[in-house]
Amino acid sequence: MSSRKRLLRWAGGIMIVLGAGHLSLLALAAWEDIAGWAERGMWAAVPLALTDGGAVQTAESLQNKVTFWAGPGSFAVPLILLGCLTWHLAGRGVAVPAGIGWALATWCVLGGVLLVPSPFFAGIISGALIILAARKEDRSRAARDPGDGPAVIRARRRR
């Protein structure tokens, strides 16, 4: 297995574990709310309240919204999907763009700073691994075509 593939597989695995762990912990911590959705129907998770804005929200409705936005409405599901996509692309030998790694790392730094302590900081590792894998792709491409310098490689990317 190439080192680029290994880096991307680790990045994807970390993202999948973080997202699945987030959803699992939420299921353990807020099982009553989630079971209530099943009893009342999924539309009851975050009901649409068509009022003039003067309605007072109950503690139960606020807890429902918090549970929804901390679970299925959070970034855990897209993080799992991104992890699966990264894993799949690594298996096919397709490089994930470094911009994805930079965006993921930036998002995790911001989330980790705003919500300390949290596992957000573990997501920085995934972002860094994606960036490293993209750089290995650039270096291997330059090694295959020694007449092309970094400027030519960047120009090819823009096409």
Language model features with spans:
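Membrane-interface capping segments at transmembrane-helix boundaries
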Residues: 91-92, 135-145
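Membrane-water interface of alpha-helical transmembrane segments
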Residues: 2-12, 62-65, 69, 94-101
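Juxtamembrane membrane-water interface segments that cap and precede transmembrane helices
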Residues: 49-66
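Short, intrinsically disordered terminal tails adjacent to the first/last structured region
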Residues: 1, 141-159
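N-terminal signal-anchor transmembrane alpha helix
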Residues: 7-36
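Hydrophobic alpha-helical transmembrane segments of integral membrane proteins
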Residues: 90-130
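Mid-chain, well-packed structural core segment of small domains
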Residues: 66-98
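Juxtamembrane non-transmembrane "cap" segments at the membrane-aqueous interface
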Residues: 33-46
